[in-house]
């Protein structure tokens, strides 16, 4: 297949490229890390569909040629719909119901189109802390004084470890890991979940934090609180104090990670469009740590080394 004859679609933060074919299908191409971007990508989609959560279905695979063909879900992302919608509550309630459904998934092993089994990994302590390290390795060295880098890294790393230790909820559920409205498509009156290749089993509050404190779509505190309340009402059996505790910790760790990822995308991959979202990621971090004693040490350290001016800097 000559990809030059197909329409290249807007991509995501991965090494995948998406093309629209004339056969109501999307060509997903990935030469780099194709195991994750093609094989695992389809395996998780298969897992979601098997558990009655809508996801793109595989039409054909050409793994040896670095691409697969999946169904075309159109261009109507939930992100676009929410930007225009006056009835955000109804949309978010539907999303929360899908999240509750996703968190009931028990499947751990999936047979891939290569006939081997893919085991969905656990979101371990080391994985979460390694992700927080992205903030320290990519963002921090570019914004603070050279002679302060080493000690600040050590200080923040210890704080991240202590925050992880404060997580309360032990139950492990299916976690999409990028559960935000840019990764949801509205197709044939149904919401489809996309970009699911990083799925793991982990803390029940993680995907909720991804959805509510999404850096791509700015929402009011009122909307954020309403979404949280929707989830809380549908999950009344969960210890609500523990849920709030874990939600806030994971939101902060996630948005610190995102600042690191967006910096890496710009510096390493030349994807500078992600830099403009860093100030809002900071805003979300500030909001979550402001009145929570769990974050007192983090708040003081961030205020010492990362000025308000730096956080709101318009990156180019």
Predicted regions and their residues:
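Acidic, serine/threonine- and proline-rich low-complexity regulatory regions
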Residues: 238-248
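Active-site activation/catalytic loop segments of kinase-like enzymes and analogous catalytic loops
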Residues: 133-143, 204-238, 252-269, 281-289
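ATP-binding pocket architecture of kinase catalytic cores
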Residues: 19-130, 168
